[in-house]
Regions:
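Divalent-cation-assisted or electrostatically stabilized phosphate/pyrophosphate-binding catalytic cores
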Residues: 239
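Hydrophobic alpha-helical transmembrane segments and their immediately adjacent juxtamembrane loops
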Residues: 248-343
Length: 343
């Protein structure tokens, strides 16, 4: 699908029977969304440029993402899509800056494009040429990444509360701070289930932050390349002034994303430490059982050998004596270990 945007006019889609050249002439922004081969050929003929293939857009070499052909600049950035879901994705978007218009090529519907279309419809007088459109799109993209990082920050705060069993903002608690008697087993099972969910959420958050950082890095290069190539172009003067601010925002957001990556690493290590602590508690229970039952088992084994010469076998109080000895051998080691603080 190809949509043509002329100054101060709504978008017009290319339909069968419509001349692509007629729609191209007044347009300052041409948006290609999942174009067909015929649409690409028609636009290439009308503009006299080469439209990159989807495979070429995915190439990671810098020379494949930022280059110049004739009077046109080709710049490809990575955008985060489906950021609100548990399965965010990344999609390449190519910006072709021509002397009098902007061509965008994409195979996804990122939120910034939706936001920018609404912004353009509300203030059409701000976007009189392709450079202004590019500046507006980049501004919308940065705003979206900032929103994603803000959302991630809130998610990390909630994850931190769950990990460290802190008081929730609403006055409640994710886990009982003081386990009630007789409910430690159920509480442990609840915590184990929570840890599994926490690990999953940390993984999803880490993936989203990684994609956001990739997007920020790619658009930092796009902005730097555009400013370098257009610094002497009078038509791009206003866009260059605005993109100077955008470049600063990109740097600050990249620093914030780096901070969040460090926080994610800390929370992951803390979660694994909590899981290890829970496992140590289980091992401790097994150790207590071994300390308590091993001595009585030894006593029972001695008196269960059934040798003929065993005085206790003919002793009337032999059986009670053995039982009392087994109880003492169980209680005494437990009391000693407890006093020493080993249990």
């Amino acid at each position: 699908m190809i949509t043509f945007y002329s100054p101060g006019a709504p978008g017009v889609q290319l339909e069968s029977g419509t001349s692509c050249a007629e729609l191209t002439a007044p347009a300052v922004w041409i948006d290609l969304f999942q174009p067909t081969t015929d649409e690409e050929k028609a636009l290439e003929a009308a503009l006299g440029i080469n439209i990159p293939t989807r495979e070429e857009m995915q190439e990671i070499e810098l020379s494949s993402r930022l280059y110049k052909e004739g009077d046109s600049l080709y710049m490809t950035g990575i955008m985060v899509t489906n950021a609100s879901s548990d399965n965010p994705t990344s999609s390449a978007v190519t910006f072709i800056v021509m002397p009098n218009r902007l061509v965008t090529l994409r195979y996804a519907e990122p939120q910034p494009f939706v936001s920018f279309r609404s912004q353009r419809q509300a203030h059409p007088e701000f976007y009189r040429n392709g450079h202004d459109v590019l500046a507006g799109l980049l501004d919308a993209i940065i705003d979206r990444v900032a929103d994603i990082l803000e959302s991630v920050g809130g998610s990390l705060d909630r994850i931190s509360l769950r990990i460290f069993d802190a008081e929730a903002p609403d006055g409640g608690s994710n886990w009982d701070r003081q386990p009630q008697k007789g409910k430690s087993g159920r509480r442990r099972r609840q915590r184990q289930g929570d840890f599994v969910d926490i690990l999953r959420r940390i993984g999803c958050t880490s993936d989203l932050v990684s994609r956001a950082r990739e997007s920020l890095v790619s658009f930092a290069r796009v902005v730097a390349y555009y400013r370098e190539m257009q610094h002497e172009n009078p038509a791009a003067r206003e866009a260059l002034v605005h993109l100077k601010t955008v470049a600063g925002d990109l740097g600050s957001l990249s620093d914030h994303a780096t901070f969040m990556s460090g926080k994610i690493s800390f929370l992951l290590e803390a979660t694994l430490g909590m899981i290890n602590n829970e496992q140590n508690g289980i091992i401790k229970i097994v150790s207590v059982a071994a300390v308590v039952f091993l001595p009585p088992t030894l006593v029972a084994s001695v008196y269960g050998m059934n040798f003929e010469v065993m005085p206790e076998l003919k002793w009337v109080a032999g059986y009670p004596f053995a039982l009392i000895l087994m109880v003492i051998s169980a209680v005494l080691p437990y009391a000693i270990f407890k006093r020493k603080g080993w249990l």
